[in-house]
Swiss-Prot record:
Its EC number is 2.4.1.212. It comes from the Eukaryota. This is Hyaluronan synthase 2. Residues 1-11, 67-374, 424-429, 497-510 are cytoplasmic.
Length: 552
């Protein structure tokens, strides 16, 4: 016992020293700015900090590739499908078409005897259409429905403590005695909805799968996740490959689709190699129910800065599994399609909410670094502090008073994006990943200031994203973007003012003209490809029936 505590203390000290040393090392490399390669007049340079970031991308891609090889080998591993599984669907003001597609995909799941529990966040007349769709798709004679005036934590109007207890027991009994059931309950947020499903199921099943109401599941998605949990008893949770259902509806959804692929099949695949996936996404995830009930109350009652948390449910659920020392995995063999915002403002609000939960959960996650591979510490430091280094770099380049610095920065952003997207295209076997380089512009212009705004408002709670039937009227997310653009515009004006004081040399003019032409041609080429792709694939998608997940 004493030996285990001593080893635990050593691991805590070791991971802490490693993380601090890594951060100090990166900071020192950034400040010193040592250059390996440097041309005359400083038109191009490649330094220690750049070499470190390049090495990170190469190493991350390598481990992702190795994890994908392991996934392919697991196909040959036979398993017995004798474990009980329950699918929990969280619904809130869902688009009827998306909800219908979600439930139709649920009916096509190949895992035998899977139980379906859909909980609707809201019990007003405006929410009844979701229950009607559930009964229509799942079969009125094969499913049950129940309108609950309250939920597990709040009593209904005029309800006593005793009657609230009885209604809670009734809901639990309905869930346990029906293979398919839909419950409408008093509004309380997504975490309240998920809690109802977890609490009502109790320990009656072996594995619990989570799903959002805008998600279409691949028929084999449940089977593939069960395989991962069955192969290793120390794996506590597993997530699948989330693809975009409405990728051709707008430019924002299209860029999100290529970003999703990169996030899951490179970043999370790499994390999975070391058994420390940071977030099992809500649209497609599965947990050991025995673990779930060790922390479900703590998960629901999570507080941050004195306020109860109402967003970041999936990320905190994953962190709770990691806190127990269990591994979390990713499998590309389990797939789904999900809706993503097609409007810029809704997307910005979504990204701000996700960034809030990321930074909050980063602090919580840090307490468990010592229980997992050093890669978990390493990646947390790199991804957690990268935005700050990037902002410092951008401001520094824009206010140095040299037009070439700004142009070089724009070219470098696209070059790095192109290198990453080229590797992703090879791994995926699809040229569409080349558009990932366009997402880098969206990251620099919008996501970067959204991250800073998320930190500044991290204790502000709420559902985070309005229902799909609601028009977005919250424009506050545009404030940080406007401030960021003002800062960049100030840098451009300052640079033009400084450069106008002295004439350009002939060599400088040549470099600027060539750089501008390369940048302009790059954009013309990609935008042309985008228009061609949208016209070709957009028409094909209109008549397509989503009987299975297609990687297009």
């Amino acid at each position: 016992m004493h030996c285990e505590r001593f080893l635990c203390v050593l691991r805590i000290i070791g991971t802490t020293l490693f993380g601090v040393s890594l951060l100090l090392g990166i900071t020192a490399a950034y400040i010193v700015g040592y250059q390996f390669i440097q041309t005359d007049n400083y038109y191009f340079s490649f330094g220690l900090y750049g070499a470190f970031l390049a090495s990170h991308l190469i190493i991350q891609s390598l481990f992702a590739f190795l994890e994908h090889r392991k996934m392919k080998k697991s196909l040959e591993t036979p398993i017995k499908l004798n474990k009980t599984v329950a699918l929990c669907i969280a619904a809130y003001q869902e688009d009827p078409d998306y909800l219908r597609k979600c439930l139709q995909s649920v009916k096509r799941l190949t895992y035998p005897g899977i139980k379906v529990v859909m909980v609707i966040d809201g019990n007003s007349d405006d929410d009844l259409y979701m229950m009607d769709i559930f009964s229509e798709v799942m079969g009125r004679d094969k499913s049950a429905t129940y309108i609950w005036k309250n939920n597990f934590h709040e009593k209904g109007p005029g309800e006593t403590e005793e009657s609230h207890k009885e209604s809670s027991q009734h809901v639990t009994q309905l869930v346990l005695s029906n293979k398919s059931i839909c419950i409408m309950q008093k509004w309380g947020g997504k975490r309240e909805v998920m809690y109802t499903a977890f609490r009502a199921l109790g320990r009656s099943v072996d594995y619990v799968q989570v799903c959002d109401s805008d998600t279409m599941l691949d028929p084999a998605s449940s089977v593939e996740m069960v395989k991962v949990l069955e192969e290793d008893p120390m794996v506590g949770g597993v997530g699948g490959d989330v693809q975009i259902l409405n990728k051709y509806d707008s430019w924002i959804s299209f860029l999100s689709s290529v970003r999703y692929w990169m996030a899951f099949n490179i970043e999370r695949a790499c994390q999975s190699y070391f058994g420390c996936v940071q977030c099992i996404s809500g649209p497609l995830g599965m947990y050991r129910n025995s673990l779930l009930h060790e922390f479900v109350e703590d998960w629901y009652n999570q507080e941050f800065m004195g306020n109860q948390c109402s967003f970041g449910d999936d990320r905190h659920l994953t962190n709770r599994v990691l806190s127990l020392g269990y591994a979390t995995k990713y499998t590309a063999r389990s797939k789904c399609l999900t809706e993503t915002p097609i409007e810029y403002l809704r997307w910005l609000n979504q990204q701000t909410r996700w960034s809030k939960s990321y930074f909050r959960e980063w602090l919580y996650n840090a307490m468990w670094f010592h229980k997992h591979h050093l890669w978990m510490t390493y990646e947390a430091v790199i991804t957690g502090f990268f935005p700050f280094f990037l902002i410092a770099t951008v401001i520094q380049l824009f206010y140095r008073g040299k037009i070439w610095n700004i142009l070089l920065f724009l070219l470098t952003v696209q070059l790095v994006g192109l290198i990453k997207s080229s590797f992703a295209s090879c791994l995926r076997g699809n040229i569409v990943m080349v558009f990932m380089s366009l997402y880098s512009v969206l990251y620099m212009s919008s996501l970067l200031p959204a991250k800073m705004f998320a930190i500044a408002t991290i204790n502000k709670a709420g559902w985070g994203t309005s229902g799909r039937k609601t028009i977005v009227v919250n424009f506050i997310g545009l404030i940080p973007v406007s401030v960021w653009f003002t800062i960049l515009l100030g840098g451009v004006i300052f640079t033009i003012y400084k450069e106008s004081k002295k004439p350009f040399s002939e060599s400088k003019q040549t470099v600027l003209i060539v750089g501008t032409l390369i940048y302009a041609c790059y954009w013309v080429m990609l935008l042309t490809l985008y228009v061609v792709l949208i016209n070709k694939c957009g028409r094909r998608k209109k008549g397509q029936q989503y009987d299975m997940v297609l990687d297009v």
